[in-house]
């Protein structure tokens, strides 16, 4: 993968950061849900008693769906954790503020107004931040790690 493609992917991660946090909460809620299955839910007399009863276990389709959700959950958790740790590698305070604002989903204009500087300055800072993260991703082989979750998403 070229540096530009990695940069686009990192920008997408940053843009989707809040979405990933919400999806992690939802997936945790779905995967940790406990279903209480009561016994004797089928009839014991009459025509219904002769009908086949449903299985109390989990079907193969449900297990595959749970596996896909778990892989997606682990992938999103890994990305969110990586983006959170990327803040530690940003040295300049202004760059940290821009990165934090980007993670919040703020636009160039909103960040520029917040820092009282031009959008072009924000674009240059963002490019420097993304370049720094691209180098860290390449050093850590993070994309290869994420490819193990690729089939889930």
From Swiss-Prot:
Protein name, UniProt field: Uncharacterized protein YjcO
UniProt source species: Bacillus subtilis (strain 168)
Source organism superkingdom: Bacteria
InterPro entries found in the cross-reference section: RNA_pol_sigma_r3/r4-like (IPR013324), WH-like_DNA-bd_sf (IPR036388)
